[in-house]
Design a protein with these regions (language model features):
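Positively charged N-terminal leader segments that act as targeting/secretion signals
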Residues: 1-17, 21-37
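Alpha-helical scaffold domains
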Residues: 41-277
């Protein structure tokens, strides 16, 4: 775990050691071993500084680190500092969450906001998703949303218990949409997209989404995603939003783009949508 946490530290220290000792053709032996000893002392001291403030949970999470994935995934969430991304693949973190949810420390972890690492936030969302009691689950979601700071954490699957309480959830969604907070708004639109586009659909729902005005990229992208999905599921009700250009120009174009890319939109519908670009 320590080596994983240190990452690129060892090569830096090792290169310094090599540069200082390799040219030493005369004073080999004692001098060289002394320098190696000092190098190891420096290295251990650095590791101690790096890890002394880590919680036990954070240490366990770093044991799951995949450095190549960390480098790749950090590019997908550019507003998060790479130093705050451990680099844990979602299936691995999901398996960890299932086991961790049964531990005594899980409940305490939910109270420890804000978190330091991106994966801690994702773990938090996974734990919330498993809460069966609707009132408790909603309470935890509302506690967490102010700390959500990226699209990936925001877009985690909706808690299962929400599907059984759609009428009760609607006023909360309206509050989310009116919050003025980027990821709270995005989360609310995501709920409407995932829970209210099938049997429980009502024309008022796309109207709620269309009424959201924002300059935030991640809000507007979610609005476009919502309408592209809505066109696939509720074409007759939602196509007027495109025909009458009720959406902002950017969202209008992005909605058409995403709908045309969707396998759920027919070829005939795609041809029609392209006429409104």
């Amino acid at each position: 775990m320590v080596i994983s946490r240190a990452g690129g530290i060892l090569p830096d220290f090792f290169m310094v050691f090599c540069q200082e000792t390799a040219p030493d053709r005369v004073n080999r032996g004692t001098s060289r071993y002394r320098r190696f000893f000092l190098f190891m002392v420096q290295f251990i001291q650095h590791i101690n500084r790096e890890t002394k403030d880590m919680t036990e949970l954070q240490r366990r999470l770093f044991e799951l680190q995949d450095k190549k994935y960390q480098a790749f995934h950090s590019k997908l969430i550019p507003n998060i500092e790479p130093a705050h991304v451990i680099g844990i693949r979602t299936p691995v973190l999901r398996n960890f969450a299932k086991a961790f949810a049964k531990e005594d420390g899980a409940e305490a972890f939910l109270q420890e906001l804000p978190h330091t690492y991106y994966e801690e936030n994702n773990l938090h969302m996974m734990l919330i998703g498993g809460i069966r009691d609707y009132a408790q689950c909603l309470y935890e979601v509302k506690r967490m949303l102010p700390y959500v700071d990226n699209w990936a954490t925001c877009d985690f699957p909706v808690p299962k218990c929400f599907a059984k309480h759609k009428e009760e959830l609607l006023p909360e969604i309206r509050t989310f949409l009116a919050s003025g907070e980027t990821y709270t708004i995005r989360y609310g639109i995501g709920l409407l997209m995932r829970l209210y586009l099938d049997a429980d659909f009502k024309p008022e729902y796309p109207a709620m989404v269309a009424a959201v005005t924002s300059e935030e990229y991640y809000v507007n992208m979610m609005i476009a995603w919502y309408f592209a999905t809505a066109l696939a599921k509720q074409w007759e009700t939602c196509i007027p939003y495109i025909e009458e250009r009720r959406l902002s120009p950017w969202v209008h174009r992005k909605t058409i783009q995403k709908a045309v890319e969707s396998y759920r939109i027919t070829d005939e519908q795609k041809v029609y949508l392209k006429t409104f670009r």
